[in-house]
Amino acid sequence: MNIGIDMMGGDFAPLEAVKGVQQYLSNSEHTIFCIGEETLLKELFQQHGVSSPFLHIVHAPDAIGYHEHPTKALKEKPNSSIAIGFKLLAEGKIDSFASAGNTGAMLVGAMFTIKPIKGVLRPTIGSLLPKLEGKTGILVDVGLNADCKPEQLNQFAILGNLYAKHILNIENPIVGLLNMGEEEGKGNLLAQATYPLLKENTHIQFMGNLEGRDLFNDKADVIVCDGFTGNIVLKTAEAMYDAAAHQGLGNDSFFSRYHFENYGGTPILGVNKPVIIQHGISNAKAFYNMIKLSEKMIESKFCQIITSNFENL
């Protein structure tokens, strides 16, 4: 297993990335391809006493900044850590690629270098939602597709369902459509047109409409919405954590589960190989969990599972 990590992406990279890799390699025998400025990375790994036959540094002299145009930057910076990461992934030299760098560049690279799985209308990104009773759900889409068609939301439900089952280990995930009321026929035109598709979808267990007040209870494991709505929900949840932390509740058993560092990042669901995006302010723990999520997606053959399911639709 070869896991690719962009060591230059993130506000605190490459130092925190190095610490995350150090923590992972202390208890793993999977090879980590660390993509970044070779001299700097060697110096940092040496300073932290990291020496492992499973550590492989790939030199990338350039990096894509947060404010650079994704498509333009990937084209003009072929030697950037993100561009080289996608090249290695496309060539099969690594089995997954993850970064806390430029989100747009990661999305463009996934869409045009790795490409969507056959039959997937639009890949999606999801965010994990902590539940009050201790479970974890997933919200899809959270920003990749601001405007959606009903058929796309129907597929997001399938992709989220597969993720809940094979990555979150939820045996029989329940799918809900985020809406302004529980009754069938509620909502805007998109929600009204999506409901019957989800209701007739034999690949999921659809419970119906789900109101915003039920996001954090156990009514649904997979919550489906367009990316515009999902991104607002995600940012509101993040703001709720910040407010709780400001009030001294950051270590509360429930609110602490909102912290991004506890999760491995956001996978792009529906592309041919595992691609993971992590928060730009990632610390060592976040990088470590990003590597662990990469490992799980590879071991579970998650992308192959999606491919198989979409062949049978």
Spans of model-derived segments:
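N-terminal phosphate-binding or glycine-rich loops at protein starts, especially the Walker A/P-loop
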Residues: 1-42
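Phosphate/nucleotide-donor binding subsite
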Residues: 50-94
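Short glycine/serine/threonine-rich phosphate/pyrophosphate-binding segments
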Residues: 13-18, 79-89, 96-110, 121-125, ...
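Glycine-rich phosphate/nucleotide-binding loop
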Residues: 111-135, 139, 215-313
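Glycine-rich phosphate/diphosphate-binding loop of Rossmann-like nucleotide-binding domains
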Residues: 15, 33, 39, 146-208, ...
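Glycine-rich phosphate-binding loop
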Residues: 88-107, 182, 186, 191-255
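Short helix-capping segments at alpha-helix termini
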Residues: 25-29, 46-54, 168, 198-204
